[in-house]
């Protein structure tokens, strides 16, 4: 299962952890993905979107 927003295509971000001793290890910041139902002209569609996208969909009144 891909950790990707179905509407915006946004995926996880990569970066580094830094300890107090300044050691570096790679890490990922995953999206807060949720399954929501979106209104379309053909009915409703279930998509996996991030919490940020859900806020935008609510603002545009596109959630079912």
From Swiss-Prot:
Transmembrane regions listed in the UniProt entry: none
GO biological process: translation
Pfam families per UniProt: Ribosomal_L28 (PF00830)
GO cellular component, one term: ribosome
Keywords: Ribonucleoprotein, Ribosomal protein
A single GO molecular function term of this UniProt record: structural constituent of ribosome
Family statement: Belongs to the bacterial ribosomal protein bL28 family.
NCBIfam families, alphabetized: L28
Listed name of the protein: Large ribosomal subunit protein bL28
Organism, scientific name: Mycoplasmoides gallisepticum (strain R(low / passage 15 / clone 2))
Gene designation per UniProt: rpmB
């Amino acid at each position: 299962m891909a950790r990707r927003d179905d509407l915006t295509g946004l995926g996880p971000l990569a970066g580094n952890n830094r300890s107090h001793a300044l050691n570096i290890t790679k890490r990922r910041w995953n999206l807060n993905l949720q399954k929501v139902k979106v209104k379309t002209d053909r009915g409703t569609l279930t998509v996996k979107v991030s919490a940020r996208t859900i806020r935008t969909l609510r603002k545009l009144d596109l959630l079912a």
